[in-house]
Every structure is written in structure tokens, then in C-alpha cells.
């Protein structure tokens, strides 16, 4: 091995080692967080914050089926007790007043800071007279015993009014002391995990703990609980299921694709050495691309990795071109000197391969401009992988090939393929009609071609979605995504903004436009409001004087309310309420779901809206009513679809820009608009026919179909460029034609298995690229010029 050869191989090994080290240290994930935008608008920012850190992403809906109602209730109680003691869970509710004591103690201790009724008028003699009279009247009711002990310290009923105001409007029915479904056949629990929605590892660990805890409690109850089973749903369940499905699918299709490609290469080469050498560009491309994405983005998405492993089908093309095109042209031709043949290939064919590679890179470079990291990842992976594979083919493989190694004679196959090409040329008119019919179909169905629903990309099966909907309805967990959001630089700022919105929202409730609303300021009033409420509390002398007047005509003496006077004086000088004071109460959980701090230090207050009975919320009228308040009205479901629609529009625009970039590069390289049109026409025809075929099969196109179309153009550009080269050199040679067909089969073998993945996004890619690449070759051959002098 001469110095030049040694330097090239050593440099490649060193770079591959570095890339492998970076790839092994890369963080891999299968959640969809990288498919959230870098710079969302106001509504999308609320959605993104909720998906990443909001309470909605941490909810687990739990049901216990089987056994008897009593056993289910016992299991529910024991499971809730066990889970509350574990660090994985922030809250566990099952209908028992497990936090009733903490909630009551907190509300009682801070009742005058929490109550919206705390103002100077509330402590006038007239107001006190009415309040005390109402409290005395309630002593005859079912809660009279409890109220009797509370009356001396809280004669105005501030504590119970506050607790009543924060009580959820509807809760599941109780059976044997715990929540149960309406038919009583299922015990229900609502569990909140501590881990954020994007920490799927922690969410999965919490689910394992939950299921293990249930199994232990069921075993502890013995035979009576043997028939009990656990049902769990919620975002964490969907996220962990999706990750598992994607990971298994990526592994499955990668192995199948690799096996098909290896089988194809063995069929072509009939040489283990050539097979191993031919895989080097592929493996280098995958390793270098994975390392580049890991370094550039900090995390490698499972979807990107699945896409990348399928890219083996295109990356293997380069070695096929080298090995086949540098082989003997026919039985009469003596086996060429191996090194001379490879140098001749570099001189004759590398410019065409290089132009095809650059064309592919230009197309995918447009995706880097997307502010959606997932789309940019796919673009970066494709660019780096194709570039690395091509460079290894150009510089490394010729140095590694043994001097006497040559590919078997493929001239017979090439000659048969030549006859096929001539037959395809005779079918130009029918193929043109096929393209026109496909274009007409797409034009006629233009309003139904694209599926702009985010759910279309979900791998979650319908039975899981149905089970979630059933649990959600049984437990009364609202699936309404309507809320009002205000953002600010501090917690105090957003709490004040939430308080300012309350009068407008109460007006909407009175008008019947909404059924109600919640607010973080209900559980933690702003400091400004708390100080105002403290300032409204009277001193002892004044309060005692008002009480003496207030009790006139009532069957009670003013002296009985000395605890009331003492507590009011204590509240006047007590420290203001903070988030830390709410710990160990259900108020903390409610507050944390509505008061969010983002990763940049900003704050958001969310005010969930409840729909009026029997009708949805008219969000347009709500927006009109809140105009000028600085608040935004968000429909999370609609916003998620709008986010995907924006994603899709961005991808379409960038793809068109990529095609224009390809055309510009080809024009610069070929210096002929006619030749550029001849190169691009078969690729665009293939895309049109594939898209129409998918629509005819009842599919609506999604984001990954679009990325697949880009891949069809990228892979097909090599075919079209070789046919263009053949026209300028008297026709395409049989071995070149054979190399194109085998390269095409490699692409089909790489992407075809994606159809079997069971993951919509991967299946969409396979359904586009596999037939699209085949059609790109067919159209390139059909539109190639007739031979006019024989190949050279």
C-alpha cells in the first residue's frame, strides 16, 4: 500500500472512529418533541408548554375492573395509599377525602387572604348580620354539627364558601367510599406523575411502578382479588406505547432492509469481499449522519433514525455504480486491469455521480431552513449521509479493492435491459397519458389530497383511543381544550392579569357563553390582592363594635365571636400566602396545572373554560369579549392541528424551494435548459403518478409522503443524469444500464420494508419511495433519446 493509499484509508478510519464515538454518545428519543416548532406563535406556545411541562401531559386515568365492588374499593384504597408514598407521583385521587384535612386547614388558616369577599364592606354591621344569620340558619341542616364548631371563629362562612368555590363542578359517583364508573363496574383513580411529559423514560418508569404496585396489592388481598385487572390510559401511556412501537419498527425494518440489500448485492457481485466493501459507504453514511444530527440537534429522533436506515437503499447505489460500471463490458472483453478500470470510472462517471449527489443535497438542504427541528433533522441526516457515502465510494473504495477483484460479467443482463428500454420508449404516449390522467386526478381532488390532521401521524390504535375516551368520560376528566392564557415576566404579573380577566369571564358566564372557568389566582391570589385584602380587615376595636350591632335580633351574643376577632387580627399581620404554603394540599396540584414557568424564565397563567350545558363554547365571541385584555383564547385541539398544518405548509414550500434549487444547480452544471427539463421531467412524472396512485387507494398525503417525494427526486436524479450522459456519448452502455437497475432495486429494498413497519409516518415514506424510485427509472428510460450510434 503506497503512501497516498495509506493516508486516505487512515484518514477515513480516523474520521469513522470519531463519528462512531459521537454516534454512540448521542441521545436517542422516540417522542415527538423535536417535531414542535422552535418559534411558535402565542397559541402554539401554550400548546407546546402544555405538551412539555403542563399538567395535561402528566395525567394517568386508572380503572380497576373485575372482582366485587367491595374488593375494587379496597384495591383502590390500598393502591392510592401505596402510590402516595412513592416519589414518582405528585397526586393520587380516588374519591376518598385523602387531603380533606390539609385542604380544610389551609383554607381555614388563610381564609381572609383567599376569599374574594374580603373587603371593607364585608365587615360592616349589616354585612355581618346577614352572614351570621345565614350561618345560624345552616346549623339546622345536615352539616350543622360541623358548622357549630366553626361558627365562633368563622361566623361569615368564608372557609366553606372558598372550599365550595374550588370544588370541581362534577365528580364521579362514589361506591363504597371511592370513585366508580356510572354503572359501578369499575373503580376509578386519577394519578398525576411528577415527571414532565417529555421525559418518557421517567413516565415509563412511573407506569411500571403503578402496575407493579397494583399487582402487589392484588396479591396481598388473595383469592378474592384474583379477578381484578388494571386499566391505564393517558398521554404517558400513549407516549410510551408510541416509543415502543417506533423502536420495534425501526429495528424490524432495518434488519429486513439490510437483509434484502445484502441478498441483492450477493446476487449481483457473487463475492463476499465486494459485498463487504459495498456496504462501507452505507455504514459510513449512517454513522456520520447520526453523529452529525446528535451533535447538531442534541438528540436523534427515532423517526429520523428509521428514515436514515432506509436511506441505505440510496447510499448503496454509489458502490454499485463503481463496481458494475468498472467491470467488463462483455464476454469478449478481457477483464480490465482493476486499478486502471477504477481510475477510468472516476474519470468517466464520477462527475455524473457527483452531480447527482449534489442535486440530492441541494434538495434536502432546503429542509434545514425549517423551524421544526424534526424536519431539519431529516434534511441534515440525508445531506450528511449521502455526502459521506459518495465520498467513501470515490476516494476509499478504489484504494481498498484488491487488484485482481472484478465484478462478474453483467453484459447479458444489460443487453436484455436495453431491449426493455427500447420497449419503454415505444410506450411514451401511454405513459404521457398516465401522467396527464394522474395530474388531472390530483387537480380534481386538490382539496382532499393532503391530510392536515395531526392524528393521521399517530401510531396509537383506535381501541386504545376508545378506552381512553371511556375512562375520561367515566372519571369526568374534561377533554375540552378551551382555555384563556396570559403571559408575563413574573409569577406576580400573570396572577394579576388572571385576576383582571375574572370580571369579564364572570360576565360571559352570566350571559351563558361559557359554563364556568377556573383561575390560578383562585388558589394563589397575587401579592397585590392579598395586601389589599389584609388592608380591608378591621382592627379589633372596630370589629367588636360592628359585631355588637350585627348580633341585634340574632339568637347569639357578640362575646361568642372572640375567636373570630382574634383570627382577623392575626390575618392582618400574617405573612402573605405563597406557593410553598400550598404544599401537601390539592390546591398545589390545581395551581401547578394553571401556572407554568417556561424554560426561558417567562410565566403563563392558564384559565380553563367549561362549556355551557349542551353546547360548545363560541370561542369567537369569547375572543371579542376579551379583546384588549392581552389574553389569548386557545383551543388546544384546533391549535395542534393548526400546528401540523403549518408544519405541512412549511414542508411543501421548502420542498418546492428544494426542487428549484436542484433545477438551478442542474442548469449551472449542464448549461442547457433542454437537458435540465429532460432530467427533471421523469422525476416529476414519477412523483405525480405515485401521488395519484396513493389518492386512488384512498390515502391522503401527509408530511412523510412529501419527504418521500423529495427522496424519489433525489434518488431518481442519478438515473436521469446517467441517461442524459448516455445520450451525449452515443447511448447508455449495457453495464451502466445494469448498474442503474440494481441500484434502483437497492433503493426499493431499503424503503420497501417501511410499508410493514406499522407506524404511519414510516409506512407513508415506504409507500412513496419504493414505487416512486421504480417509476423514476422507468420514466427516465422511456424519455431517454433513441440510440444514434451505439454506446461508448
Kindly label every feature range from the protein language model.
Residues 1-30, 398-399, 403-453:
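Signature of alpha-helical transmembrane segments and their immediate interfacial
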Residues 20-21, 34, 74-187, 202, ...:
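Alpha-helical transmembrane helix bundles of large polytopic membrane transport and channel proteins
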Residues 22-67, 166-178, 423, 427, ...:
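Solvent-exposed, non-transmembrane loop/terminal regulatory segments of multi-pass membrane proteins
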Residues 144-267, 271, 570-663:
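Extracytoplasmic
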Residues 274-321, 675-722, 752:
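Hydrophobic transmembrane alpha-helices and their membrane-interface caps
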Residues 279, 331-370, 729-757:
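Pore- and gate-forming transmembrane helices of large, multi-pass membrane proteins
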Residues 295, 311-327, 350, 354-412, ...:
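Transmembrane alpha-helices and their membrane-interface boundaries in multi-pass membrane transporters
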Residues 428-551:
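Juxtamembrane segments of multi-pass membrane proteins
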Amino acid at each position: 500500500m503506497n503512501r497516498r493509499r495509506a493516508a486516505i484509508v487512515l484518514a477515513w478510519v480516523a474520521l469513522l472512529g470519531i463519528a462512531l464515538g459521537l454516534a454512540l454518545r448521542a441521545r436517542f428519543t422516540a417522542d415527538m418533541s423535536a417535531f414542535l416548532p422552535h418559534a411558535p406563535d402565542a397559541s402554539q406556545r401554550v400548546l407546546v408548554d402544555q405538551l412539555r411541562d403542563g399538567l395535561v401531559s402528566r395525567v394517568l386515568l386508572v380503572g380497576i375492573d373485575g372482582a366485587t365492588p367491595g374488593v375494587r374499593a379496597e384495591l383502590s384504597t390500598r393502591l392510592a395509599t401505596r402510590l402516595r408514598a412513592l416519589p414518582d407521583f405528585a397526586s393520587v385521587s380516588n374519591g376518598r377525602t385523602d387531603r380533606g384535612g390539609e385542604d380544610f386547614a389551609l383554607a381555614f388558616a388563610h381564609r381572609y387572604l383567599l376569599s374574594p369577599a374580603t373587603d371593607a364592606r364585608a365587615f360592616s354591621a349589616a354585612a355581618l348580620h346577614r352572614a351570621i344569620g345565614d350561618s345560624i340558619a345552616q346549623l339546622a341542616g345536615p352539616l350543622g354539627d360541623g358548622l357549630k364548631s366553626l361558627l365562633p371563629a368563622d361566623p361569615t362562612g368564608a372557609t366553606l364558601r372558598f372550599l365550595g368555590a374550588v370544588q370541581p363542578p362534577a365528580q364521579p359517583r362514589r361506591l363504597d367510599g371511592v370513585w366508580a364508573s356510572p354503572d359501578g363496574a369499575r373503580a376509578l383513580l386519577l394519578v398525576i406523575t411528577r415527571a414532565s411529559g417529555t421525559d418518557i423514560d421517567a413516565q415509563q418508569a412511573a407506569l411500571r411502578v403503578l402496575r407493579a404496585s397494583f399487582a402487589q396489592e392484588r396479591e396481598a388481598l388473595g383469592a378474592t382479588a384474583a379477578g381484578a385487572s388494571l386499566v391505564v390510559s393517558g398521554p404517558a401511556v400513549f407516549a410510551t406505547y408510541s416509543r415502543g412501537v417506533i423502536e420495534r419498527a425501526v429495528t424490524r425494518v432495518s434488519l429486513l432492509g439490510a437483509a434484502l440489500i445484502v441478498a441483492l448485492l450477493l446476487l449481483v457481485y457473487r463475492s463476499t469481499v465486494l459485498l463487504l466493501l459495498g456496504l462501507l459507504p452505507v455504514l459510513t453514511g449512517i454513522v456520520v449522519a447520526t453523529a452529525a444530527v446528535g451533535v447538531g440537534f442534541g438528540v436523534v429522533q427515532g423517526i429520523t433514525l428509521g428514515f436514515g436506515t432506509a436511506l441505505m437503499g440510496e447510499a448503496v447505489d454509489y458502490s454499485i455504480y463503481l463496481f458494475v460500471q468498472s467491470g467488463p463490458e462483455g464476454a469478449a472483453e478481457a477483464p480490465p486491469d482493476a486499478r486502471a478500470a477504477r481510475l477510468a470510472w472516476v474519470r468517466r462517471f464520477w462527475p455524473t455521480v457527483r452531480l447527482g449527489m449534489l442535486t440530492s443535497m441541494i434538495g434536502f438542504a432546503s429542509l434545514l431552513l425549517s423551524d421544526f427541528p424534526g424536519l431539519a433533522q431529516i434534511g441534515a441526516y440525508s445531506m450528511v449521509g449521502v455526502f459521506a457515502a459518495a465520498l467513501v465510494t470515490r476516494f476509499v473504495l478504489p484504494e481498498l479493492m484488491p487488484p485482481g477483484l472484478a465484478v462478474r460479467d453483467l453484459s447479458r443482463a444489460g443487453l436484455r435491459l436495453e431491449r426493455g428500454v427500447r420497449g419503454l420508449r415505444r410506450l411514451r404516449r401511454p405513459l404521457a397519458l398516465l401522467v396527464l390522467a394522474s395530474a388531472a386526478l390530483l387537480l380534481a381532488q386538490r382539496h382532499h389530497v393532503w391530510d392536515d390532521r395531526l392524528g393521521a401521524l399517530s401510531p396509537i390504535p383506535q381501541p386504545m383511543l376508545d378506552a381512553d375516551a371511556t375512562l375520561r368520560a367515566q372519571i369526568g376528566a374534561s377533554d375540552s381544550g378551551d382555555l384563556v392564557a396570559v403571559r408575563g415576566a413574573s409569577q406576580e404579573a400573570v396572577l394579576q392579569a388572571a385576576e383582571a380577566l375574572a370580571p369579564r369571564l364572570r360576565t360571559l358566564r352570566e350571559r351563558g357563553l361559557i359554563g364556568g372557568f377556573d383561575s390560578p389566582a383562585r388558589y394563589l391570589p397575587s401579592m397585590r390582592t392579598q395586601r389589599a385584602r389584609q388592608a380591608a380587615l378591621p382592627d379589633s376595636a372596630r370589629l367588636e363594635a360592628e359585631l355588637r350591632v350585627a348580633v341585634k335580633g340574632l339568637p347569639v351574643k357578640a362575646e361568642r365571636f372572640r375567636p373570630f376577632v382574634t383570627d382577623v387580627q392575626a390575618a392582618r399581620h400574617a405573612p402573605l400566602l405563597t406557593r410553598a404554603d400550598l404544599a401537601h394540599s390539592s390546591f398545589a396540584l390545581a395551581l401547578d396545572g394553571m401556572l407554568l414557568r417556561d424554560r426561558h424564565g417567562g410565566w403563563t397563567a392558564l384559565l380553563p373554560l367549561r362549556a355551557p350545558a349542551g353546547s360548545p363554547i363560541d370561542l369567537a365571541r369569547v375572543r371579542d369579549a376579551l379583546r384588549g385584555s392581552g389574553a389569548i383564547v386557545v383551543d388546544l385541539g384546533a391549535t395542534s392541528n393548526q400546528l401540523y398544518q403549518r408544519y405541512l405548509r412549511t414542508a411543501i414550500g421548502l420542498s418546492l424551494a428544494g426542487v428549484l434549487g436542484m433545477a438551478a444547480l442542474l442548469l449551472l452544471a449542464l448549461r442547457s435548459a433542454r437537458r435540465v427539463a429532460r432530467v427533471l421531467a421523469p422525476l416529476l412524472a414519477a412523483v405525480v403518478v405515485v401521488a395519484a396512485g396513493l389518492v386512488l387507494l384512498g390515502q391522503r398525503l401527509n408530511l412523510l409522503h412529501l419527504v418521500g417525494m423529495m427522496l424519489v427526486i433525489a434518488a431518481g436524479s442519478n438515473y436521469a443524469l446517467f441517461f442524459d450522459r448516455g445520450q451525449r456519448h452515443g447511448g447508455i452502455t449495457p453495464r451502466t444500464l445494469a448498474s442503474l437497475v440494481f441500484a434502483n432495486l437497492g433503493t426499493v429494498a431499503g424503503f420497501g420494508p417501511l410499508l410493514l413497519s406499522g407506524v404511519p409516518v414510516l409506512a407513508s415514506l415506504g409507500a412513496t419511495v419504493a414505487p416512486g424510485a421504480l417509476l423514476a427509472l422507468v420514466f427516465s428510460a422511456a424519455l431517454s433519446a433513441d440510440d444514434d450510434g451505439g454506446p461508448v
